[in-house]
């Protein structure tokens, strides 16, 4: 299934910087309106408890639909995949505006939050597959990994600066105004990233192929899973890392019920991405995909262990306690996507890459729908420690399974 890299990547310097600029703005916008941290925290903080628990399952259901649609969307977009990114960013911004303007009380507000999360899942899934396919077409393997890590770091720094110096001016000391201002800035960032996407330009000529139906998409995915051992390992490992990816949402819900500050979570999450960028870059160079995944799972387990100690000692309400846990959870999450892309982008044939990414992401979304609802519910049982123990056990299982990942991306 391996396919050689396209020649003359070294001559393409401009695409990297345009992709980095667009990705940085998009990352900052996503950080300020983060569906895994900001929206669940706001919902729980303002009394929309059941909605807070349902946000990630709703997002996952939308993600299932989005990943099912992504192969067809890529084929319809053809070489103009940058336009697909632009439209996706504009829709994402509009959805965040809906959350920002609705009164945060009652069933109607809860329904809006849930529906926006579901719609966001669709849009983000299509956008993610399109973005990964676009950078795979424009950049070499090394530059792809570098882009994913660096854009996350710079975008996070931008999010921290906005959170510290701009959002407080919008809030005027009022908590609700502060939360709404955060969402408005996030929407503005997403809209700006949509404009930047227009300047990315079309991809190189894509392979002509017939448009596949949903059934054909999954038929191809299962066929590759049966015939290619590397893809089976990739899918199983991705499924078991779903709890690691849910870590920040889990701790956001626990923090919202115990007096934590949203601005602290946004800043700490952004710092975690900044610190994680050079860390995982070094790990990838020395230990490859396996090192990134094992390290990610172990850091997630460390976050859970620290949370257990802090809650047992009555220290969870302190900024240093929940801030440290959030920092570790964010660092752990940051390695998962980059490692997965490094694993699949070289081994998958170019004409099947988008389909296989969408197929695997759909399976992960199915698991996350069930797991997210369960973890979202137990996370709000803040008077007991056993929910954190569950997260610790799942992280350890992920660490053990990830030992089967290749040390290098080309090692099947």
Predicted regions, residues:
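Loop-to-transmembrane helix entry/capping segments in MFS-fold secondary transporters
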Residues: 49-50, 141-150, 350-360
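C-terminal transmembrane helical hairpin of 12-TM major facilitator-type secondary transporters
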Residues: 291-337
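Helix-loop junctions on the cytosolic side of multi-pass membrane transporters
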Residues: 194-211, 403-412
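Helix-loop boundary and gating motifs at the non-cytosolic
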Residues: 2-65, 230-267
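Helix-to-loop junctions at the C-terminal end of transmembrane segments
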Residues: 66-80, 170, 276-290, 379-380
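Transmembrane alpha-helix termini and helix-breaking/packing motifs in multi-pass membrane transporters
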Residues: 39-45, 72-76, 100-104, 159-178, ...
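Intracellular juxtamembrane helix-capping segments at the cytosolic ends
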Residues: 125-139, 334-348
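C-terminal ends and interior cores of transmembrane alpha-helices
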Residues: 89-107, 299-316
């Amino acid at each position: 299934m391996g396919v050689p890299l396209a020649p003359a990547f070294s001559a393409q310097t401009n695409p990297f910087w345009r992709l980095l600029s667009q990705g940085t703005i998009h990352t900052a916008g996503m950080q300020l309106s983060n569906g895994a941290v900001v929206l669940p925290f706001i919902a729980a903080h303002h009394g929309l408890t059941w909605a807070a628990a349902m946000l990630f399952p709703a997002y996952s259901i939308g993600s299932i639909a989005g990943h099912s649609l992504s192969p067809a969307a890529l084929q319809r977009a053809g070489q103009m995949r940058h336009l697909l990114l632009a439209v996706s960013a504009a829709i994402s911004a509009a959805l965040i505006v809906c959350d920002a303007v609705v009164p945060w009380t009652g069933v109607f507000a809860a329904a809006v939050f849930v529906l926006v999360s579901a719609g966001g899942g669709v849009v983000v899934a299509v956008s993610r597959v399109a973005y990964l396919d676009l950078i795979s077409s424009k950049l070499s393997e090394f530059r792809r990994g570098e882009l994913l890590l660096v854009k996350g770091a710079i975008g996070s720094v931008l999010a921290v600066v906005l959170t510290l110096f701009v959002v407080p001016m919008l809030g005027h000391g009022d908590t609700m105004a502060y939360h709404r201002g955060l969402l408005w800035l996030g929407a503005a960032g997403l809209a700006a990233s949509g404009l930047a996407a227009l300047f990315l330009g079309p991809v190189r000529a894509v392979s002509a192929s017939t448009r596949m139906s949903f059934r054909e998409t999954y038929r191809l995915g299962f066929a590759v899973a049966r015939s290619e051992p590397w893809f089976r390992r990739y899918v199983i490992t991705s499924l078991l890392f779903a709890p690691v990816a849910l870590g920040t949402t889990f701790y956001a819900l626990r923090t919202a019920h115990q007096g934590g500050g949203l601005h602290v979570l946004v800043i700490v999450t952004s710092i975690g991405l900044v610190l994680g960028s050079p860390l995982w870059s070094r790990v990838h160079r020395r230990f490859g995909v396996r090192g990134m995944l094992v390290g990610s799972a172990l850091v997630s387990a460390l976050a859970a262990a620290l949370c257990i100690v802090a809650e047992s000692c009555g220290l969870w309400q302190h900024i240093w306690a929940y801030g440290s846990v959030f920092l570790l959870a964010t660092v752990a999450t940051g390695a998962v996507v980059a490692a997965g892309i490094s694993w699949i982008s070289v081994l998958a044939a170019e004409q099947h890459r988008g389909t296989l990414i969408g197929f695997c992401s759909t399976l992960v979304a199915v698991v996350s729908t069930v797991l997210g609802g369960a973890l979202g519910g137990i996370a709000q049982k803040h008077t007991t420690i056993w929910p954190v123990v569950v997260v610790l056990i799942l992280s350890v299982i992920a660490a053990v399974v990830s030992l089967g990942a290749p040390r290098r991306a080309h090692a099947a």
